[in-house]
A protein has these predicted regions:
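Membrane-embedded alpha-helical bundles of multi-pass transporters/translocases
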Residues: 2-456
């Protein structure tokens, strides 16, 4: 029997555009915050890394907290849309604050300014916005194919935005005056764009009635299912092995992204051309977008996500190994590096596209095994993964730069720094892809749900 469809094409496109807003925050922050803080503000990368790690201590708690709040929210706009709408206002303000650190402050005050703004952005505002945005996948449709399509549209916009930001930001900073003023102006422009697009995305979809989401008209049953505290919510998540797999995978992907963002340093100090970072961004994001276009069709053709995800990520792992080989050829064979980078990105695309549908399947697994509807809490893995993985990745890059004696005042870095940059940009991404492939080979949530339904 054909599944009921809930969405028009413009609903899916409107929803997907929300990740333009998400990435004018995340892509901008993850790609450029370290080089801004070290080369413009003059802060120590090791101390910055430590502050980011300290900030991450709050993130796990706030993810579950906001996920639980979303599950228990009842409003005319639904459960998730109010949090997505209002959370972004704080995102815009704190993003500008991070890239507007006064240069005339003492260094202690500058570190404190960064820590406060970064923590508020990640632990509070981005958490509320991103969990709500991700949870909409399960709240506006029950059709699994539409959930995959929503994920594909979302990440097509995400990677296109990331590509644009990585390609134009450094040039835009220079064009707008350079230095601290240039960074501040660019941040303001991105924040305004994000506010406008996020608002459009919120009002492009409508959440389904709660009774339809849980296949019951019994209001008391719905209310009973929502009666759990934060500790119980954490236990529900920890008890879902597929949630834990996705959460770890998400964290590893964000650490991967932080290592790839070291391309700004790699291009500048090893390849000798800062502009090559933008070229590598094209080699990553265009294949990802192409893969996302075909992901819904491939999922339908292969009757599920499992085989597609495992096979495509195996291709990505092999390709990243070849990127490393090409990178260690003398000063680096740029042509081969670009080729294998593109193939690796093509392999990573399907999982990006169907990840939200996999999380929805995880939520269904909890419903089938525990009879608890925890869609908002379940989608905490997206926010937790982005913040914890991205933050930890950025912290690690700061620590490794400091340990390798990076000096922003030098045009030629010491050999220890050059070696470390190669490890961060070439070796670690390959290792992370290999681990993700192994985890995906165990991600049989669709099969588990089918068995549970058959047993009812």
């Amino acid at each position: 029997m054909t599944e009921k469809r809930y969405l028009k094409w413009y609903n899916k496109v409107g929803y997907g555009s929300g990740d333009i807003a998400g990435n004018v925050v995340y892509a901008f922050l993850s790609s450029f915050v370290m080089i801004y803080l070290t080369n413009t503000v003059g802060l120590n990368p090791g101390i910055v890394g430590t502050l980011i790690a300290v900030s991450k201590l709050l993130d796990g708690v706030t993810d579950i907290f906001f996920g639980s709040l979303i599950d228990k929210t009842h409003s005319k706009m639904g459960k998730a849309r109010p949090w997505m709408l209002y959370g972004y206002i704080g995102c815009a303000i704190t993003l500008v604050a991070i890239f507007a650190i006064p240069t005339n402050l003492g260094q202690f005050a500058q570190y404190a300014w960064f820590l406060i703004a970064y923590t508020l952005l990640n632990a509070v505002f981005y958490t509320a916005n991103n969990i709500a945005y991700s949870a909409l996948t399960a709240l506006v449709t029950k059709n699994s194919a539409e959930q995959v399509e929503m994920g594909s549209w979302r990440f097509m916009f995400a990677f296109a935005t990331s590509l644009l930001i990585q390609s134009i930001t450094l040039g835009a900073v220079t064009a707008l005056g350079g230095g601290a003023a240039g960074w501040r102006t660019v941040a303001i422009i991105y924040a305004i764009i994000g506010l406008l697009v996020n608002t459009l995305s919120v009002f492009s979809v409508k959440e389904l009635p709660e009774g339809e989401l849980v296949d019951t008209t019994d209001k008391k049953e719905i209310e009973q299912d929502e009666k759990y505290n934060l500790v119980q919510a954490a236990k529900l998540l920890a008890g879902n092995k597929f949630y834990m797999m996705i959460c770890v995978t998400y964290i590893l992907q964000q650490i991967y992204g932080a290592m790839i963002s070291m391309g700004t340093y790699y291009a500048t100090y090893i390849l000798g051309n800062q502009n090559l970072f933008g070229v590598f961004s094209w080699a990553i994001n265009i294949p990802l977008i192409i893969a996302l276009v075909f992901t819904p069709t491939l999922v339908a053709k292969w009757n599920g996500m499992y085989k597609l995800n495992v096979m495509s990520y195996t291709l990505a792992t092999i390709s990243r190994a070849l990127v490393a080989v090409a990178g260690y050829m003398g000063s680096g064979n740029v042509t081969l590096m670009l080729l294998f980078t593109a193939i690796a990105a093509l392999g990573q695309g399907p999982w990006q596209g169907d990840m939200n549908a996999a999380i929805a399947a995880c939520s269904e697994y909890t419903w089938l095994t525990k009879h608890k509807r925890v869609d908002g809490t379940m989608y905490s893995c997206t926010s937790l993964g982005v913040k914890l993985g991205g933050g930890l990745g950025t912290a690690i890059t700061g620590w490794l730069l400091a340990a390798s004696h990076f000096d922003s005042a030098l045009t030629v870095q010491p050999a220890s720094c050059i070696s470390m940059l190669k490890i961060m940009y070439l070796v670690i991404p390959f290792a992370l892809d290999a681990i993700i492939t192994f985890i995906l080979s165990r991600m049989k949530v669709e099969e588990a749900n089918e068995k549970l339904r058959a047993a009812v």
